[in-house]
């Protein structure tokens, strides 16, 4: 468990958060520029000393302002990845990695050289120097070097912000591998919804130095009282379990979490039991009173209306739905709501027109 109570005030900005975060997953600190994301990270790292703070990683206290405890940054078992990798230009990639590795006694190493280079796909780069690497390659080396310090916590401050869309798409699969294969907790700062949707298990939504929400990403994205629900990309994350594959039509069947309901997505074959993360946008769900088998829409689920919220314009409303325990959002017109008589507790059918596979 990660506990971070942080309070500080500067001219024109104040931070006041109390975060209780899981100790094994990827937590995204999400919000607009100036919301306090990087300040939180710097305080946790000890690079910024908050006057009032309590920071504990599992059983290790890094700061307790009431008791006068402050562990300096270099003694905190953490890795920090910045927007641009700060590599030593005069050293090869291998020497840069060894610099991180040699700081840790052999008995305390949780990640070795082979594991780090394979996870980040940089084995073929070891003899090169940083000036001969692309931006994405430099960032992967920087992440590998941070991992080789065997951190108890990995802090990533917008690691893809300096990369173009092509380089981002190249590096995201490697970040997903870190998520899937390592047990190191990660705090990931970003203002890009696509990155957060693909990587995060837990979401902290920050605004003006305060945490508007903190919880599992699926539940948090489905909250109608948060500004994320008003975004054009509003929707929910579903992590389904593969339960079947139709080779003729190249369709995977995914079982929804804790439910007997399924959705189908176009995808390459996967092994039964594997998990696949998807996003269903609110704009891609329509509602109907009855199920229609004579439809080109593959995914039709029985749902219950939970609540309603006005959208960002007078013509639409947002409807929160429950599909066997999985939350969904639907963005429909006020006219359609009135025609269907939509109200909390009502049973309807959700027609999902598109499912975005996050891979």
UniProtKB/Swiss-Prot annotation:
Reactions it catalyzes: molybdate(out) + ATP + H2O = molybdate(in) + ADP + phosphate + H(+)
Domain ABC transporter: from-to ranges: 1-233
Positions that bind ATP: 31-38
Main localization, broad class: membrane
Boundaries of every Mop domain copy: 294-359
Cellular component, GO annotation: plasma membrane
EC number in record: 7.3.2.5
One Pfam family hit: TOBE
Membrane topology designation: Peripheral membrane protein
Role played: Part of the ABC transporter complex ModABC involved in molybdenum import. Responsible for energy coupling to the transport system.
Family classification: Belongs to the ABC transporter superfamily. Molybdate importer (TC 3.A.1.8) family.
Name of this chain's protein: Molybdenum import ATP-binding protein ModC
Species of the source: Pseudomonas fluorescens (strain Pf0-1)
Name of the encoding gene: modC
């Amino acid at each position: 468990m990660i506990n971070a109570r942080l309070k500080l005030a500067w001219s024109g900005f104040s931070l006041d958060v109390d975060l209780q975060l899981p100790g094994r997953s990827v937590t995204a600190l999400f919000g607009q520029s100036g919301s306090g994301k990087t300040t939180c990270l710097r305080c946790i790292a000890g690079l910024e000393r908050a006057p009032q703070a309590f920071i504990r990683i599992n059983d290790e206290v890094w700061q307790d302002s009431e008791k006068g405890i402050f562990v300096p940054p270099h003694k905190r078992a953490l890795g920090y990845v910045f927007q641009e990798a700060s590599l030593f230009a005069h050293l090869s990639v291998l020497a840069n990695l060894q610099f991180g590795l040699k700081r840790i006694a052999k008995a305390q190493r949780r990640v070795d050289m082979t594991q780090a280079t394979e996870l980040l796909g940089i084995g073929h780069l070891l003899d090169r120097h940083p000036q001969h690497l692309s931006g994405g390659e430099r960032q992967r080396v920087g992440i590998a070097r941070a991992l080789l310090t065997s951190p108890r916590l990995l802090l990533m401050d917008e690691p893809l912000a300096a990369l173009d869309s092509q380089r981002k798409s190249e590096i995201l699969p490697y970040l997903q591998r870190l998520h899937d294969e390592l047990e190191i907790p990660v705090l990931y700062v970003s203002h890009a919804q696509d990155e957060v949707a693909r990587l995060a298990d837990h979401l902290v939504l920050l605004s003006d130095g305060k945490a508007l929400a903190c919880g599992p990403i699926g539940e948090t994205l489905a909250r109608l009282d948060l500004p994320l629900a008003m975004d054009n990309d509003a929707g929910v994350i579903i992590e389904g379990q593969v339960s079947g594959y139709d080779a003729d039509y190249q369709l995977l069947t995914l079982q929804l979490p804790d439910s007997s309901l399924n959705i189908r997505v176009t995808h390459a074959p996967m092994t039964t039991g594997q998990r696949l993360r998807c996003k269903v946008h609110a704009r891609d769900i329509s509602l109907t009173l009855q199920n229609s088998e004579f439809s080109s829409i593959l995914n039709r689920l029985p749902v219950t209306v939970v609540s309603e919220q006005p959208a960002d314009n007078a013509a639409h409303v947002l409807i929160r739905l429950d599909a066997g325990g999985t939350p969904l959002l639907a963005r429909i017109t006020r006219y359609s709501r009135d025609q269907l008589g939509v109200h909390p507790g009502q049973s309807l059918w959700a027609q999902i027109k598109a499912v975005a596979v996050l891979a």
